[in-house]
Amino acid sequence: MVILAYRCLSSARDFEPAHRRASGLGFAEAQRRGWLARRASGRTLEWSTYPGHYQMRVWDEAYRRRWIERVLEATAGTPFDGIMADNDVFDDYYGLDLRSLAPDDAAAPHDLAGLRAALGDFVDDVGRSLTDEGLLLVPNIAEARREAGRWERHAAWGGGFDECWLGWGDKALFDEETALAQAPQLDGPGLCIVRTPSGGVG
């Protein structure tokens, strides 16, 4: 059995205790160090569909280094075999509107291609560091079917997770072409974890 710890790549959550969190970093530390993404108005980016989740500056190398440090600290000496890293996003699911990011954040992406590139670099940074410690990285690789080679690249450090396998939900199943485009993910590399519409709740 492989046991993975959940950590979010892309958000910090203001309702989580710093010592027991799903985010890589606690909210207070992220805020203090200036790693919360901001709009031109100076407001932080709270996810529209998940209150209390705030977009992190995943394009900031200092944030990425600290995220890795914190996750390795939290994982050391535990039974976990690695990390399931959530929100390796492909599209804007959370009302980010990247064009509105603060203009003085020179490294900030202003389109989704730029955000995907930043997350790709982040996944590689995390993967190398976890591999050095004998740990797996299994990102939740959103919509890998939409970009050739995306699954293979992001799953290279231990495997991949697709939480929308064969459909968005019970009332939004994929057509045959879309479902078949997901099929190669079953061949790896590494672990392949998929979540299908269940017909139930939860």
What are the roles of these predicted feature ranges?
Residues 1-202:
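Glycan-processing catalytic domains of CAZymes
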